[in-house]
C-alpha cells in the first residue's frame, strides 16, 4: 500500500514542493486517502474488540469495557516526554514503548502505517519536507467530530471510551516530523531549472514573475488558513466546556454507589479529554511555530532553538494533578474542569502571542502585499464566529480581485534584488510613491500635495476673495494681488476645510452690497434666530448675565470682521495690548482678553446644555439661522427688539439668586441688554439724570430705523445697572465695551463723498480706527449730522478716498478707474490710449498691442509698461526706476535699510547727499577743480534730491552722529563753550560714522534724528566768516582735501582694514580729554544732555570744518561733518588739526623740521583710546552691545596687521625723511654753484665786491635755526611736499585713481576706466566679513547679479546710458529687449496707417 501510494502521488508532491505549497498542499492531496485508510483500520479493530480510533464516533457504549488495560507509570512518563517527541527540531523522534496488549500493537501498527504513508523524501531535489503529522489530522477530524457533538446521541460513556482509545493511540504512536529547513532553496532550484531550460530571456522573466506571484498568493492563503484554525480552536473550547458542564449535571443525578463505581471512570475520562485537548493545542502551537520558522528561513534569520525541554507547561502539571486525584472523591471533577478551562485559555494565548510575533516580523519580499490584502486586523482574543470568518474570506477575495496584488508585485520585483539587506519597500524611493498613479516623490509633503490632485482637496483659502488653493505657496502668490487694495489685511495661512466656509466668510463677500458688512454666521445655541446686528454686539458682552447662575453664551463663537473692527476702536483708548491676528489694533487684544476673563469668572450652569449635542447639529443650526435677506432680517430684528423690551419691562425686577428663570428667556434679555449699554462714564452719572444715554441703538438699527427704544426700557436698564444684586464690574464692561459705536459710521450716515459703503470699509479697515477720549466722544443720535463726528486717521487721504469711491467693485467690468492711473503723458502712452479707443477687444483685460489676455487690470497695466518702457516706481535712494512696485521692494533690499533710516554721505561744501561714497568722491572733485571719472550729469543723476521724511523724534541727536560707526568720535564744546550744533546736546558727544557697506546691518537698531538738524550742523560748519583764524583755511580747500585723502583708512584687497601708523580701530577718538590740547577742559560734561540748549553765536563757528585724522580714517569717502571742536584760546595753542594743515603751507626749508613735530602729534591722535562707555553711550543698548562685539572681533583680526602697518609706516617715514634731506642738499649745492659763478664775475669786475660776495656765500652755507611750532609765516611755494608725492597706493579700488592723477593718460575713456576699476575691485568691507559678493557684484551699489551681462546692463542704470536707439522716434533704451517691445508699437501703428491708406485709395 505504501509503494502504491507513493508511486501515485510522487509527481503531485514534487510539483507542490516546487511551488512552495509544502504543508497544506500535501495535506489537501493526502487527506481523503488517509481518512479512508483509517476508517478501514477502525472497522477491523471494532470487529476484533479493540478500542476504536478517533473517527469511530458512533461506537457503542460497551466499548468502554473492552480489554483495554490501563497505562503503566512508564507510559505516563512517556506521555510527559511527548512534547519533546513532537518538537519541530527533531527529524525522527523517539519511538514510544509499545503496549503489551494486542490492541495496543494493532493501534501502533496502524499509526506506523499512517505515518509512513505521510512521510516521503523528495528524490529530485533531496530536500526534507515537513508533512502533516497525525496530530494535525486529529485536529481536523476532531473539529468534524465536535461540530456534530451537539446533535449526537452518543452517551457520555461512549465519548469517554473514544477519548481513552484516542489517548492510548497517541501515547503509543511514534510521531515523525520532517522540518522545512530549505524550502527557499528548493524554490531557488526550480527557478534555476526554469532559467536553464528557458528558450529566451523574456520566457525566464515571465516564469520568475509567475513563480513569485504564486508564492506570495499561497503564503497569504496559508495565513488565512491559520486564522481559520484559530477560530476552530475557540469553537472547540466552547463545545468542550459545554460538554463538561453536561457531564457534571448527569453525574450529580446518579446514585452515590454508582458514583463511587464510576468515579474512576469519570476521572479517567476527564483526564483523557484534557490530554486530547493538550494534543490539539500542541498541534496548533506546532503549526504556528512551523509557520514562524518558515517565515524566518525566508527572511534569512537564524531560527532560535526550541524552548527548554525541562520546562513543563501548565497543562502538563494539571494532567498530573488529575491523575493523582483519580482515587479521591468525585468532587475533584469540578476543580479539574476549571483548571482545564484555564489551561485552554492560557495555551490559546501562547499560540496567539506566537502568531502576533510572526506577523510583526519584517518580510523582505512581499510584506506589504499581505498587509494590503488582509486589511482588517482585529484583535484575535475577541469573540469570533463563522460569519466573521466568511466576512474575512470575502474581504480577502475582493481585495485580491482588484489588481492591488499585481501592482504590489511589480513593486516587489523592483526591490527583489535588495531583499537580502532587509530594506525592501522601506526605502525612500518606495516610501513616497503615489498609490493612485505610481509617481514617486522625494518627500512626504510633496506626496501629500500630489494626492490633493487626486482627491480635489484645496485646504488653503484666501480670506479676501475666498479662492481656494492646494498649497500655501500658491495662496501667497495669489494674495499679492490684494496687497494694493488691502495692504493691512494679513493672509490667513491656516488650512480651512470646505465644510467650515460658513464660519470664515471672505472679506469681499462681507463688503458686497448683497450681504451687509455686519452679517455673519449666527452662533449655534438653543436661542431663537437673532438678528445680525444683535449678533455682532452679542460677543463682547455675552459672558455676563443678569444672574450669576446663567453663564450666557460660551466664548466659542469666532467674532466677525465688523466686530473685530468695533473692538479695535473701543479698546484702543483703554489698553495697549496687541492682538495676535490684528496687531494694528492696539486695544483689540485687551478687549478680547477682558471679555474672556469675564466669561471665565462667571459660574457654569450645569443644569442645561447650552449647545447642540454634535458638531453636525451645530452646523445645521447655524445654516438654518443664516440670514437670507437683509430686509427680512431688519424687520425681524425690529420686532425682536420690541418684544424683548416689552418682556424686559414686565419681568426685569430685582433678581435674587434663588429665582430660576428659563435660560432661553434670560438669553433673550441678555441680547437686548447688550444692545443698549453704551457710554463708559461712571455708573452714577447714568443711573438717574440721563437714563436715555445708557441705551443706544446698534449700527444696523440706526441705519434703517431712526426711532429709539422706549424710555421705560432705558429706565429699566438704569435700575438694573444700579441694582445691588448685580455686579458693578459687569455693568462697567457693558457700558465700556460699546464706545466704538460712536466712532463707527453707519450705511445711512456715510459722508456724501463715499457713495459705496464697501469701499469705505475697505479703505479704513483695519488700521485707521483711532481712539478718542470719553470727553470728545459724541453720543450717537438719529440726526443726519452724525457723520460729522467720524474720526479721521492720520493716514487718511481725502483725495485718494474720493478716488477710491469711484473704483468699481471686484469682478466688475467698469473701466472708469482708468482715469486715475498715474502714467506719464508720453507720446507712447497717448498712442496706446488711442489704439485702445479705436480697436475692438473682446476681453476687458486684453492687450491692444499683442492681443494677450491678462488676469486683471493691474496685470494689464504692468503689461503695457513692457511696450511703453515706462517705469513709474522710482527709488529715492539711487534714483533707479522700476515697472512694478514689487520690483522696487526687492530693490530696496540692496540698500539694506528702509529709506527713513538711511545714513547718507553728504558733501561738506554744498550739502548734497549721495548714497554711494564713490559718487561723493567724484562730486568733491568738482569743488576742488580736479578731473573726475564721472561726468557731471552722471554725478547729478546719483544725487538724492528728495531726502526721506523725518520719522524720528526731533529732540534726538544728529542722525549721522547717532548712526555712525564706532571708529570715530565727535568732540563737543569746552567747559564754557557752546555745543557744536543747534538742536543737538553739547558735550564731548562721541558719535560714530560709518560708510554705506559697513553700517547696513546696524542701521535697523539705530535711532536717527531729524534731517533738518543735519542741515543746521552742516551750515554751521561752513559759516566761518566770523572766524579770523579760518581765513587761511578757506584759501586752501585743495590742501584740505588732499590732506583728508592722505590720511584715509587703508583697506587691503581682501577687505581687511589696514590703518596708518599706530592707528587702531578703537582708538580713533577726538575727545578733547584725549587729544592733549590746551583748550580741552577736563571738566567737560560727559553726557549729551548735560549742557543747555545752544545759542547761535559767532564763537561756536570759530573752528575750521577740518576733521581729525581719526575721523577721516573711518571710511574711504565718509565726509559727513561732525560737531565743532572747542574754541581755541590763541594761535600759539592751536590744535593738532591746525598744525597738520599748517605743514603744507610752510616753506620747504621748514617742512623737515615741522615733520618731526607732526609725527608725534599724529601718533598722539591715533593712539588715544576711546573709552567704551563714552564712545557709544549715546546709542541704544542693543546697538551698543553689537558695536562692542564688532569692536572685539575687529581687534582680534587686526592684531597682526597693526604691527605690520606700524613697521611699514616707520619705513615710509624714513624714506620720506631721506628724500627730504636729499632735496635739501641738492638745493644747497645749486645755490653754492650760483654763488661761486657770481663771485668770479664780481672779482673780475670789482675787486672790492669779492669780500662782500665771500661773506654772502658764508651766510648761505650756515644752517638756519628750526622755526617754532606756533609760527604761521607763509613763504613762497616750493617743491611738492614729499609726504604727498610718496603716498602709498589706495586699497579700496586699486585700479581706480582716487587721488588726482599726475598725468593725463588716465583721464581717457572715463566711463570705461571706472567700469574696469570697479568691477574687479574688492568690496568695501571694514568689518572684515567673509566675502559674499562674487565677480558679478556691482561696485557702486553692491548688488549681485547672476551673470556678467546682467551686471553690464545694471551699470547702465548708474551711467544712464541707453545704447539702443529707435530709428523711428530716436528714443533710447537700456536693453535690446525693451527696444524690441517698443518697436511693436510702431509696427502696429504703421500697419493701421497702411490699412487706412489702402481704404482711402479704394
Curated annotation (Swiss-Prot):
User: Matching Pfam families, A to Z?
Assistant: zf-C2H2 (PF00096)
Q: Where is this region: Disordered?
A: 32-103, 244-271, 489-547, 593-651, 974-1038, 1058-1137, 1205-1289
Q: Where is the composition biased (Gly residues)?
A: 974-989
Keywords for the protein's UniProt record, in alphabetical order: Developmental protein, DNA-binding, Metal-binding, Nucleus, Repeat, Transcription, Transcription regulation, Zinc, Zinc-finger
Sorted alphabetically, which InterPro entries does this protein's record hold? Sal_C2H2-zinc-finger, Znf_C2H2_sf, Znf_C2H2_type
Q: Where is the composition biased (Acidic residues)?
A: 249-271, 1001-1017
Gene3D superfamilies on file: Classic Zinc Finger
| Primary localization | nucleus
Q: Kindly list the GO CC terms recorded for this protein.
A: nucleus
- Record localization: Nucleus
Zinc finger (C2H2-type) stretch: 432-454, 460-482, 845-867, 873-895, 905-927, 1336-1358, 1364-1386
Which residue windows are transmembrane per the record? none
Listed Polar residues bias regions:
1020-1029
Low complexity: compositionally biased ranges: 57-69, 532-547, 1067-1122, 1234-1261
Q: Which domain of life is it from?
A: Eukaryota
One example of the protein's molecular function in GO is: RNA polymerase II cis-regulatory region sequence-specific DNA binding
PANTHER family xrefs: HOMEOTIC PROTEIN SPALT-MAJOR (PTHR23233:SF87), SAL-LIKE PROTEIN (PTHR23233)
Q: Name the family.
A: Belongs to the sal C2H2-type zinc-finger protein family.
Role:
Required for the establishment of the posterior-most head and the anterior-most tail segments of the embryo. Probably function as a transcriptional regulator. Could repress the transcription of the tsh gene.
**Protein's name in the database:** Homeotic protein spalt-major
Give the species.
Answer: Drosophila virilis
Tell me the name of the encoding gene. Answer: salm
